[in-house]
Amino acid sequence: VRVVEPFFWRAFGWARLEVDVARQSVSREADRDAQQVARTLIPVASRDQALWLLARVMPDAHPNPPPDAGPPSRARLKAPLSFHFLAAWFGQRYVYARTGRVQMSTIIVPLVKVQSVRLKSGPLQRTFHVATVDVDTAGRRWQASARCRDEHEAVEMVRHISERARLSRRVPPPRPANPIPVPAAG
């Protein structure tokens, strides 16, 4: 699932919620438009309403990054324009990755859906001692990428995410105990 907050929407507190569906083939342009609509859970809503719907689709998902979710300060040299918008973190059930200066998007991947976790580090990244962790799923539209992470942190992320993904496939996910109230339109 992806929470998208384009630049001009943020002033109004608007967001879009999308879902990446596995194995959708596109044969014609008309089918492409229909599939885009089918992938959009809510095209435009207040951020509170989008987060309410997210809580219904993915219980216990928290798309707001914790204070330590950002990249190390030396990554500012590698990604000067997007540095403040990069974040990555994971919990007991989900992996989160936030990117985008103009169109900020937070990708939320259930650990049970993780197919592979990869560590990438090009020559420029190695110069700054940072790396990227890619979390792959069966969907084809996007992937969760933890960009510009400290190289040691990235290795630990790969290890922890892989281990938690393996464990999560063994245990059925819990259901929310209380119904979630609908936020007021505002």
Give the ranges of each region predicted by the language model.
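N-terminal basic, Ser/Thr-rich segments that initiate or prime the first beta/alpha elements at protein or domain
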Residues: 1-186
